[in-house]
Amino acid sequence: MVFLGVTMAAGLLVGRGPVPKVMAVADMEGYETLKVFTEVLSLVQKNYVEDVKTKEIVYGAIRGMLNTLDPHSAFMKPEQYKEMQVETKGEFGGIGIQIGIKDAMLTVIAPLEGTPADKAGIRAGDKVVKVDGKSTKDMTLTEAVEKMRGPKGTQVTLTILRDEFAAPKDFTITRDIIKIQSVRHKDLGDGVGYIRITQFQERTSEDLAKAIAKMKEAKVTALVLDLRNNPGGLLNQAVEAADFFLPPKKLVVYIKGRRGDKDEFFTREEETFQGIPIVVLVNEGSASASEIVAGALQDWGRAVVMGTQTFGKGSVQTVLPLTDGSGIRLTTAKYYTPKGRSIQNTGIAPDILVDAEGREPEIAAPVDRPREKDLDRHLPNDQAADKEPAIKDLKKDQPAKKTEPRRPGDSPRDDPQLKRAVDLLKSWRVFRNLPPTSQANPPPATP
């Protein structure tokens, strides 16, 4: 199993073929290091002032080992590993927020819509300084997620630091069963359909097929595919989603590991929406698997990508089970769009740059929201600077906006970005129906 999503309280996975076997350490340096580890473990067991639990010490060492790597590699205790497997089905107990580490602080990337955290007023960019009174300083993402999760009806208190607060403020949130509805759809009228994918779970492609069937029943002639605030998910589901919008045998994405091995993923089925114009909406919260879909449609010229620069997570995590029921999530590869672009740290640059208020770059200002490049220990982009996609962050010379980013709405009336997308599709249809210049009647002469 492979991850293609931002580390978060909800948990996101990506699947890819069989899990590789864990190889034994084969070099002398590795053996010598293990000898030092066992020596320290023995000294602690024999000489520490109080009795110690060996398993907890070993787990702590493994956790520390993975914490020296990138921000998406992590250790999972047996109970965490089991819960991770449940998460891919889209249902778990918790408060519903995406979190990451920014500037050595636990930071909210985004609350999931309609969840307890969202209803309590938690915002993207909030700094979580305490969980149930315990400082988050030096707390790993795995530990933070574990503390925030729990049975329905129980409470957790997050101490939040926000620019507008004079001092940190406590938010007491009642946990609930978080059921992630990964696909939503709506007929916007005038032949324009709307499909939103909130994340890529086990059943996303099935739900997407149902949504597309509804759109075809409505006889839509243009489509908005909304991937805003989609933090990623299962790789196979991202590929299957792209399958609906591209012809067969088209490359969707390829991934490469340290040894240069390359896996390619192609579309298989006939395109469902052949010939109709598509606008893909993205923003700073669009990460990983959602960036794969947006990048594939952009590279093949199948859709216009509109919105703001995406998150920029271009790495792949493999989930490796351990013998005692625990597991590790290890970054094993990077992924590339069909044209060979790595979006690690850079993200997908939209074709049409429009901020959450519907404004274009001349008058827009950036939203202060963490991206991959802001996370501690993030991996570099391995492409030469002259080959990297242009980073079109809005108004770099202006201070970032401290207000909460606007949430996607289901209607163009309360969602300026969606309104811009709908307007573009309508104008597209008008221009497409114009007769060729040679056939058009000239304007009447003015006497």
Language-model features: locations:
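Hydrophobic membrane-insertion alpha-helices, especially the h-region
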Residues: 1-14
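Cleft-lining beta-strand/loop regions that shape enzyme active-site pockets
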Residues: 18-33, 37-54, 85, 107-111, ...
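Glycine-biased strand-turn-strand hairpin within the trypsin-fold
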Residues: 22-49, 53, 57, 67-96, ...
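Extended, small/polar residue-biased N-terminal targeting/export presequences
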Residues: 48-109, 153-172, 178-185, 419-425, ...
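Short acidic, Pro/Gly- and aromatic-enriched capping/linker segments at domain boundaries
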Residues: 322-333
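Conserved functional hotspot residues or short segments at active or partner-binding sites
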Residues: 334, 339-447
